[in-house]
Regions:
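Bacterial N-terminal signal peptides that target proteins for export
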Residues: 1-8
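Serine-hydrolase catalytic machinery in alpha/beta-hydrolase-like enzymes
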Residues: 27-110
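N-terminal signal peptide c-region/cleavage motif recognized by signal peptidases
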Residues: 16-18
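Boundary of Sec targeting at the N-terminus
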Residues: 22-24
Length: 110
């Protein structure tokens, strides 16, 4: 199973079972194998009927994705900004971005 598929399955399960109060935001963590990942969940003020998943750019989950999740929650959506690299990923520049993105590209099924 690919990393991305495992992450998506885990986050869909978390999104279905994680209880976060309406109008609140929370950084959650989850485990796949030996790796720990995080996701930022932004809940709207009223019950959301739709969840939007935000996939980060090659520089990882950061303030940009978090701000977009909050904006979507203000529009009435439950927004989940995913981390595809894991909490231990070191992202200090282009070489790091290339390395972590390469891991995802090399982990795809044919």
């Amino acid at each position: 199973m690919t990393i991305i598929r495992s992450i998506l399955q885990s986050i869909f399960l978390l999104a279905a079972t994680q209880t976060i109060a309406a109008g609140h935001n929370s950084m959650i963590t989850y485990q796949i194998g030996d790796n720990e990942y995080k996701a930022f969940v932004a809940e709207p003020e009223s019950m959301a009927s739709t969840t939007v998943y935000i996939i980060h750019d090659w520089n990882g989950l950061n303030d940009y994705e978090i701000s977009r999740a909050k904006m979507l929650a203000e529009q009435g959506y439950r927004a989940v900004a995913l981390d595809l690299f894991g909490v231990d990923a070191k992202l200090d520049g282009f070489d790091d971005y290339r390395r972590e993105t390469g891991k995802l590209y090399n982990d795809r099924s044919e």
